[in-house]
Amino acid sequence: MNVQLRMPFPEFLALIGVMMAVGALSLDMMLPALGVMGDELGITDPNDRQQVITAFLLGIGIGQLFYGPLSDLYGRKRMLLIGLGIFIAASLWATVAHSFEAMLAARALQGFGAAAPRVISAAVVRDCFVGDRMARVMSFAMLVFIAVPIFASALGMLVLLAGDWPAIFLFTAAFALVLALWSGFRLPETHAGDAGHGNRGPFRRLLHASGIVLRT
């Protein structure tokens, strides 16, 4: 499907870049804080601290199975905003986590929410463009995705110096909130959803994705 884009192309490009940045930013900003966070949560083994990263990757991996079919059924913007809401709630939960288990749960949920902008950004681009222009937009999006980790750790260190490790989660929550407001007010709905039109294809894909998760 190729829909008309009703926003300036440079703004659309910037918005897609920010959507792609959410997952990479929230993953790499935490790296400088693993030591102090582990100490406060009573985790002395450096290998155990790495589970904070693993939990996030697990959440984002599972989330990517679901947001594509769900956005086909219920619309791109709705699922994007739901995913960002989950991400923000999980980020705030992480700021008050008083046990390592709670932190792992919050990070997994944060990853699940971060999967929404990652998946839906690509779907929106496919809705709006075809051919060479789609390839150029996706190339820019992937460039942002690759470039963000280069400075995310340094940004995490700056936030850590200005505050404590929960401030990193507050930063990512604020970043996602800005994205949610920007998307909610400016991003046009590029695919309204098939749930009310008897289209069972996305539903079958969702069931298939659920089966993969359950089997693994």
Please provide the spans of the model-predicted regions:
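Juxtamembrane intracellular "pre-TM" segments in multi-pass secondary transporters
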Residues: 2-5, 191-216
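Extracytoplasmic
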Residues: 11-43, 67
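Residue-level signature of mid-helix packing/kink "hotspots" within the transmembrane helices
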Residues: 28, 57-65, 149-150
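Extracellular/periplasmic helix-loop-helix junction of adjacent transmembrane segments
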Residues: 33-62
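Helix-breaking motifs and short loop linkers at transmembrane-helix boundaries and internal kinks
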Residues: 43, 75, 96-102, 113, ...
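Conserved MFS/SLC helix-loop-helix module at the cytosolic interface between two early adjacent transmembrane helices
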Residues: 62-101
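Helix-loop-helix hairpin linking two adjacent transmembrane segments in secondary transporters
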Residues: 102, 131, 136-192
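Cytoplasmic helix-loop-helix junction between adjacent transmembrane helices
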Residues: 106-145
